[in-house]
From Swiss-Prot:
Reaction equations catalysed: ATP + H2O + 4 H(+)(in) = ADP + phosphate + 5 H(+)(out)
Protein family per UniProt: Belongs to the ATPase alpha/beta chains family.
Superkingdom, natural source: Bacteria
Species assigned in the record: Pectinatus frisingensis
Annotated Pfam families: ATP-synt_ab, ATP-synt_ab_N, ATP-synt_VA_C
UniProt KW keywords: ATP synthesis, ATP-binding, Cell membrane, CF(1), Hydrogen ion transport, Ion transport, Membrane, Nucleotide-binding, Translocase, Transport
Gene designation per UniProt: atpD
CDD domains found in the cross-reference section: ATP-synt_F1_beta_C, ATP-synt_F1_beta_N, F1-ATPase_beta_CD
Membrane topology: Peripheral membrane protein
Keyword Translocase: yes
Enzyme Commission number: 7.1.2.2
Complex formation: F-type ATPases have 2 components, CF(1) - the catalytic core - and CF(0) - the membrane proton channel. CF(1) has five subunits: alpha(3), beta(3), gamma(1), delta(1), epsilon(1). CF(0) has three main subunits: a(1), b(2) and c(9-12). The alpha and beta chains form an alternating ring which encloses part of the gamma chain. CF(1) is attached to CF(0) by a central stalk formed by the gamma and epsilon chains, while a peripheral stalk is formed by the delta and b chains.
Protein name: ATP synthase subunit beta
Length: 470
């Protein structure tokens, strides 16, 4: 293993000189161990540039406090390697694959994979498009997820992103037997801790590996932590032939960290100060998330949109890769309808009769048409009241309100808060329920019967109870 010495430290950027014939490759991990006063230093840096004269410019994965010129650095001969396999489940890791949950390190972990890996070749990829059933009515009906697809999750603070993420993890684990990997990229440490606590309480932690690189970490760690999580997910896909869920919260912070690193390396910025390699960086990550003939990685990515500007180069680079968008709406959350998914704003590439079938497509578009009409009538209702509407419009409003309530659903992971047992609704049942509402089969039932139930049969039962109590 080649040894070099530090010649310059500027914040998270470390320049290391190696013998010219032993220069480490780009993306290799280099370890620096030593003591500086009372501080024990154990730092990993990643090679980013060769400056000539045997000097490599590296980016640190943790704090560079205490580093001095002349300290010894050792080339590991490979990129950062992280543990993979079932031993990672139920644990919290950092970007280097070290456990940070204060429990003993995983015992018997045999395999370590490098975080920089090629994307699957064309001939390895699955060509057919299949729907991934989530058991969440509004998602399966309006904006269905494709197996091995990429989904953007948009929503402000407090509208239920985390609960939706945990429900997806729960349903994939129980119904598909699949594992999940959660990459926390550049978000609040408190949120990461809350997620871990909630997962532990709801019991989904044993099917999940958590990888965190929070906003207090140097940009190198935030830029690479998504790749650490992705590598763990790739093992479950390629070796265990699983259908894996990969959550990235937040994909924008990955781009932001890349832009910080780019500036630190002295590259000329492009539009709005982003790195010139923006589309390459995003593409290198997204192309590895796909279905192969062995298994699939379906990715749900929370997308922060700076200043709500969808044309910003950061989010715009992400949108080109997404197959579906799930938009959470504060207005719907205020009505008490959870999950607060906006059925008119959420989209999916596979909402196409050739992929999901004519029946599903017709029902989904029918539901959207009724809700859109209701939205248009709301101003009239607010000013003139329901009495001024025509009979046809009154019927549309009544059905729309039933549909709106029927899009709500009790979640398994929220059982201890709501007191209602969670419901997994198969896709066939979801389509049947909404189809029958659109056909007018339940026009005589009270709309409250449709709120927070699973299948349509439960709504009918709830209506009977309401009638008896009245």
């Amino acid at each position: 293993m080649a040894k070099g010495k530090i010649v310059q430290v500027i914040g998270p950027v470390v320049d290391i000189e190696f013998p010219a014939e032993e220069l480490p490759s780009i993306l290799n991990a280099i370890t620096i161990k030593g003591k500086s006063g009372d501080i024990d230093i154990n730092l990993t840096v990643e090679v980013m540039q060769h400056l000539g004269d045997g000097i490599t410019r590296c980016i640190a994965m943790s704090s560079t406090d205490g580093l001095t010129r002349g300290m010894e650095a050792v080339d590991t001969g490979s990129p950062i390697k992280v543990p993979v396999g079932e031993e990672t489940l139920g644990r919290v890791f950092n970007v280097l694959g070290q456990t940070v949950d204060h429990n003993p390190a995983p015992v018997g972990n045999k395999e370590f994979w490098p975080i920089h890996r090629p994307a699957p070749k064309f001939d390895e990829q699955e060509t057919s498009t299949q729907i991934l059933e989530t058991g969440i009515k509004v998602v399966d009906l309006i904006a269905p997820y494709s197996r091995g697809g990429k989904i953007g999750l948009f929503g402000g603070a407090g509208v239920g992103k985390t609960v939706l993420i945990m429900e997806l993890i729960h349903n994939i684990a129980t119904q598909h037997g699949g594992y999940s990997v959660f990459s926390g990229v550049g978000e609040r440490t408190r949120e990461g801790n809350d997620l871990w606590s909630e997962m532990t309480e709801s019991g989904v932690i044993n099917k999940t590996a958590l990888v965190y690189g929070q906003m207090n970490e140097p940009p190198g760690a935030r830029m690479r932590v998504a790749l650490t999580g992705l590598t763990m997910a790739e093992y479950f896909r390629d070796v265990q032939h699983q259908d894996v869920l990969l959550f990235i919260d937040n994909i924008f912070r990955f781009i932001q960290a890349g832009s910080e690193v780019s500036a630190l390396l002295g590259r000329m910025p492009s539009a709005v100060g982003y790195q010139p390699t923006l589309t390459t960086d995003v593409g290198a990550l997204q192309e590895r998330i796909t279905s192969t003939k062995k298994g699939s990685i379906t990715s749900v990515q929370a997308v922060y949109v700076p200043a709500d500007d969808l044309t910003d180069p950061g989010p715009a680079a992400t949108f080109t890769h997404l197959d579906a968008t799930t938009v959470l709406s504060r207005q719907i959350a205020e009505l008490g309808i959870y999950p607060a998914v906006d059925p008119l704003d959420s989209t999916s590439r596979i909402l196409d009769p050739h992929v999901i079938g004519e029946d599903h497509y017709e029902v989904a578009r029918g539901v959207q048409a009724v809700l859109q009409k209701y939205k248009e009538l709301q101003d009239i209702i607010a000013i003139l009241g329901m009495e001024e509407l025509s009979d046809a419009d009154k019927l549309t409003v009544a059905r729309a309100r039933k549909i709106q309530r029927f899009l709500s659903q009790p979640f398994f992971v929220a059982e201890q808060f709501t007191g209602s047992p969670g419901k997994y609704v198969p896709l066939k049942e979801t389509i049947r329920g909404f189809k029958e509402i659109l056909e007018g089969k339940y026009d005589d039932l009270p709309e409250s019967a449709f709120y927070m139930v699973g299948s349509i049969d439960e709504a009918v039962e709830a209506a009977k109870k309401i009638k008896q109590e009245a």
